Curated annotation (Swiss-Prot):
<comment type="function">
    <text>Inhibits of the DNA ejection of T4 into the host cytoplasm. By this means, T4 excludes superinfection by the phages of the same family.</text>
</comment>
<dbReference type="Pfam" id="PF14373">
    <property type="entry name" value="Imm_superinfect"/>
</dbReference>
<feature type="transmembrane region" description="Helical">
    <location>
        <begin position="3"/>
        <end position="32"/>
    </location>
</feature>
<keyword id="KW-0472">Membrane</keyword>
<keyword id="KW-1043">Host membrane</keyword>
<dbReference type="InterPro" id="IPR016410">
    <property type="entry name" value="Phage_imm"/>
</dbReference>
<keyword id="KW-1260">Superinfection exclusion</keyword>
<feature type="transmembrane region" description="Helical">
    <location>
        <begin position="37"/>
        <end position="65"/>
    </location>
</feature>
<keyword id="KW-0812">Transmembrane</keyword>
<keyword id="KW-1133">Transmembrane helix</keyword>
<feature type="topological domain" description="Cytoplasmic">
    <location>
        <begin position="66"/>
        <end position="83"/>
    </location>
</feature>
<dbReference type="GO" id="GO:0020002">
    <property type="term" value="C:host cell plasma membrane"/>
</dbReference>
<keyword id="KW-0945">Host-virus interaction</keyword>
<protein>
    <recommendedName>
        <fullName>Immunity protein</fullName>
    </recommendedName>
</protein>
<dbReference type="GO" id="GO:0098669">
    <property type="term" value="P:superinfection exclusion"/>
</dbReference>
<dbReference type="GO" id="GO:0016020">
    <property type="term" value="C:membrane"/>
</dbReference>
<keyword id="KW-1032">Host cell membrane</keyword>
Length: 83
């Protein structure tokens, strides 16, 4: 009986952790991509991911949004040797 209870508690904890990871997946993607809108995606995820539509909107925002690297202008540095 104790094994059954311990196994049930373990499954509830694992399920809860997986649910949180899936719920916040758009924010994790934004963090990994270095998105400029990481804070906005975080709060939008907290508020709207309970609905499937909100989750898909934040997911698309996280994968299509501008990253910090792409926002910087391209710079070319030319170094010449002295003759």
């Amino acid at each position: 009986m104790e094994t059954l209870v311990a196994g049930s508690i373990f499954m509830v904890l694992v399920s809860g952790v997986l649910a949180i990871i899936i719920y916040m997946l758009p924010w994790f993607i934004a963090l990994m991509r270095g998105s400029k809108s990481t804070v906005g995606i975080f709060f939008a995820s907290l508020l709207f991911n309970w609905s499937i539509i909100g989750w898909f909107i934040t997911f698309i925002w996280s994968i299509a949004g501008e990253t910090k690297k792409s926002a910087q202008p391209n710079q070319v540095i030319i170094i010449r040797e002295k003759e």
